[in-house]
Regions:
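Catalytic-loop region of hydrolases
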Residues: 1-62
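Short, solvent-exposed loop/turn and secondary-structure capping segments
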Residues: 19, 49-53, 74-78, 123-124, ...
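Conserved alpha/beta-hydrolase
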Residues: 56-76
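Alpha/beta-hydrolase active-site loop
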Residues: 83-104
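Alpha/beta-hydrolase fold nucleophile elbow
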Residues: 105-115
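Glycine-rich nucleophile elbow surrounding the catalytic serine of serine-hydrolase chemistry
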Residues: 113-123
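A catalytic-pocket lid/entrance helix-loop region that shapes and gates access to the active site
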Residues: 130-219
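Alpha/beta-hydrolase fold active-site neighborhood
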Residues: 188-260
Length: 260
């Protein structure tokens, strides 16, 4: 395939184009103008670049990865406020882009993304239903409020009881008896990997990772991983290794937070 980097000039406010513009970044994998076109969203920056996503591979399709407005390079030189960072404005961005791509590609248009990318694909379809033929949204967690109280009873209802008990037991162990050891191990890992923790300090990052452990386990691992939960008597290194696999402390590192 051929690979292109593309910048689309977009209004900051589609209802008031006189308020200025920004350049929205996208990357194109071009195979064939008659093949399907996949519009791929992350909901954040463009970290796919030239990597073909699952839907693209399945359909041997063209692919356009669209960076979300106001993330990474796709932002105005100066942002007076964030009022135009809305799902409707983003959907309008994607409508502009889809309209352009329809002039170039004759095949079916598919739209996809995971997590906030899945949500983004749904929002585009909600405002501009005729832009794509198919929407394949992976993991689109549309919350109703902050906080959304539906999550807690849902978590209570999934997974074997003994598995949940062991998972919660090591959370308690980590925060009551292993906190200092985990912070030491996380600090060593940060030094080795060149990570900094200035927006959220390291002790808070460790605590956040432990608190998020149950959520992350059921989101990314599932019941098949129950046998791999270490005992409360496991070594500090074993507990830290498990934490890093399931709910990484580095999620709160400066470089990672900058992406979101």
């Amino acid at each position: 395939y051929r690979f292109f980097e593309i910048w689309f000039t977009q209004p900051i406010d589609h209802a008031h184009p006189e308020r200025g513009t920004f350049r929205q970044y996208a990357t194109l994998i071009h195979r064939d103008p008659t093949a399907p076109m996949v519009l791929l969203h992350t909901g954040y920056g463009n970290w796919y670049y030239d990597y073909p996503g699952e839907v693209t591979r399945l359909y041997h399709a063209n692919q356009l990865v669209i960076e979300h407005r106001f993330f990474r390079t796709s932002r105005p030189a100066a942002i007076a406020d964030w009022a135009s960072l809305t799902i409707e404005q983003a959907a309008a961005d994607h409508h502009v882009i889809a309209t352009v791509m329809h002039r170039l590609y004759a095949g079916a248009f598919l739209e996809t993304g995971a997590s906030k990318g899945g949500m983004t694909s749904i929002y585009h379809r909600r405002f501009w239903p005729d832009d794509v033929d198919v929407t394949l949204a992976y993991v689109a967690p549309i919350s109703f409020a902050a906080p959304d109280y539906r999550y807690e009873p849902y978590l209570e209802g999934i997974g074997p009881a003994d598995c949940k008990a062991r998972l919660r037991a090591i959370q308690v162990e980590m925060l009551t008896n292993r906190r200092a050891a985990l912070q030491t191990l996380a600090g060593a890992e940060a030094t080795q990997e060149g990570r900094s923790y200035t927006r959220i300090d390291l002790p808070a990052a460790v605590e956040s990772a432990v608190i998020s452990l149950e959520w992350a386990f059921w989101q990314y691992v599932g019941a098949d991983g129950c046998a791999g939960i270490p005992a409360v008597t496991a070594t500090d290194d074993e507990l830290f290794a498990f934490l890093q696999v399931v709910s990484e402390v580095g999620s709160s590192a400066d470089a990672n937070l900058a992406e979101f």
